[in-house]
Amino acid sequence: MAKTGMYVGLDIGTTSVKVVVAEYIDSQMNIIGVGNAKSEGINRGIIVDIDKTVQAIQRAVRQAEEKAGIQIKGVSVGLPANLLEVENCQGMIAVNGDSKEITDEDVRNVASAALVRSIPPERQIVSILPQDFTVDGFEGIKDPRGMIGVRLEMYGLLFTGPKTIVHNIRKCVENAGLVVNELVITPLALTETILSDGEKDFGTIVIDMGGGQTTTAVMHDKQLKFTSLDQEGGEFVTKDISIVLNTSFNNAEALKINYGDAYPERTSANEEFPVDVIGQSEPVKVDERYLSEVISARMEQIFNKAKEALDQIEALELPGGIVLTGGAASLPGVVDLAQEIFGVNVKLYVPNQMGLRNPVFTNVISIVDYSANLSEVYQLAKIAVTGETVVAHHTTVEQEVTSYDNDSYDAPEETVYDEPEQKKSDEDVTTKIKGFFSKIFD
């Protein structure tokens, strides 16, 4: 259960940096502040310029502070799935003390025992997630503290990632004047937050379509089993439009928003619109079908790469189907195209928070909600990884600033797509622009 207090989530994306301030009262989330700044210094989800990224974080934080009426000191920041690896881990210890009652120290010690392994020098342990404990052979225990036992075992998941990515994220947050309260693995937060209990249990695929990369995650038996990352996203669709139509990037983005559809069969070749072409004195007419074919070509490539990875582990056989989210997923026709390519049920997840009902905010909302609901057992295991004491997540200071109303929030840096009505097809699509787990569901 979420603690009562204030929690702040930070999502450092390719196209924008988003900050959400959420207040929890009796485990109910109330979003009281949002910041959304255009990203700089980030390419394909990777930080390439620390100073520019710091500035973008500071802009987003200032917006959130003004709207929430608080001073933000610490954040839970998302860690992307780039080269993320997940493996099972197990630790076992003898219970300390004459009474043999299991304490916080025993939980920390058994987590430390589970970390004993060889890690390549370029990688580091990011997080350990306890799944259950065994006390003297009694299995399935979620919190062993207060129980009596001689032998304590812990079974969990261990997440490792590249030192460079982890360091750069921490460096940017700290240089922005903030404390990293929690480093949250974004695909884990997504699958835990947006899926129902049944979807987590029976198995579901989540595809997060961002501006610079697309992340595929599989949850089964209530565990994150698999992640895959393709460094292509919605920004690449815009670049394709810009190149094919010989127009500026900004014009291409506007065309995608106003006329774009990822499913050509829904569009018409008779519907035309003007395009400002570089080198032409007058706008050139382009039909809706042609634009849709340019968009669908890139989207098909993204989905086919995801399908290839999912086919290797037979994940498409899971009954939960696919849940799409992220800004690029909200483009009209994406759900129809995905359903055609994957051959399973596909749906779009949209956050239900007032003023933030757009998939571009799914990640940051998931980050803050996931961190707010972390258990005490997790926090104890976390100390084994960081070697630090747990930092309070809701350290904020009240300021005399304008209060924030969710209903009036406007996100000028983000694209909001409205799904149009179904359109009739009049021709087929023509020429287009050219893990480590296996059999995990046995």
Swiss-Prot record:
The keyword Cell membrane applies. It comes from the Bacteria. It is found in: Cell membrane. The keyword Transferase does not apply. Residues 407-419 have a biased composition (Acidic residues). GO terms for biological process: FtsZ-dependent cytokinesis. InterPro entries: ATPase_NBD (IPR043129), Cell_div_FtsA (IPR020823), FtsA/MreB (IPR050696), FtsA_C (IPR021873), SHS2_FtsA (IPR003494). It is a peripheral membrane protein. Disulfide bonds: none annotated. Its main location: membrane. Keywords: Cell cycle, Cell division, Cell membrane, Membrane. One of its GO terms (cellular component) is cell division site. Residues 401-428 are annotated as: Disordered. Belongs to the FtsA/MreB family. Self-interacts. Interacts with FtsZ. PANTHER family: CELL DIVISION PROTEIN FTSA, CELL DIVISION PROTEIN FTSA-RELATED. Cell division protein that is involved in the assembly of the Z ring. May serve as a membrane anchor for the Z ring. This is Cell division protein FtsA.
